[in-house]
Amino acid sequence: MALSLFTVGQLIFLFWTLRITEANPDPAAKAAPAAVADPAAAAAAAVADTASDAAAAAAATAAAAAKAAADTAAAAAKAAADTAAAAAEAAAATARG
């Protein structure tokens, strides 16, 4: 019997989710046995992970701010060019008569 596209889609999603879960296991699940074995090392790893997350967030914020600044500069340049073109057109119309 033929499987419906919906069922095929569900199976693909299931296997895709399982593959991602196996490739990137839950950090909390990995940290629990490590915390029992060596609490100091587990705490240091948690601090390092938090620091890397903070650094990634800061980098993303800086990138967003740079993009916003570039977009603002581009919009200002376009507005200035449009204003200059309108002024030149008005001057030409005045000179014609």
From Swiss-Prot:
Homology family: Belongs to the type-I AFP family.
Record-given protein name: Ice-structuring protein
Coiled coil residues, start to end: none
A single Gene Ontology CC term: extracellular region
Signal peptide stretch: 1-23
Tissue specificity statement from the Swiss-Prot or TrEMBL entry: Detected in blood serum (at protein level).
Cysteine pairs bridged by disulfides in the record: none
Domain of life: Eukaryota
Main function: Contributes to protect fish blood from freezing at subzero sea water temperatures. Lowers the blood freezing point. Binds to nascent ice crystals and prevents further growth.
Compartment list: Secreted
Bilayer-spanning residue ranges: none
Residues that make up the propeptide removed upon maturation: 24-48
MF (Gene Ontology): antifreeze activity
Keywords: Antifreeze protein, Repeat, Secreted, Signal
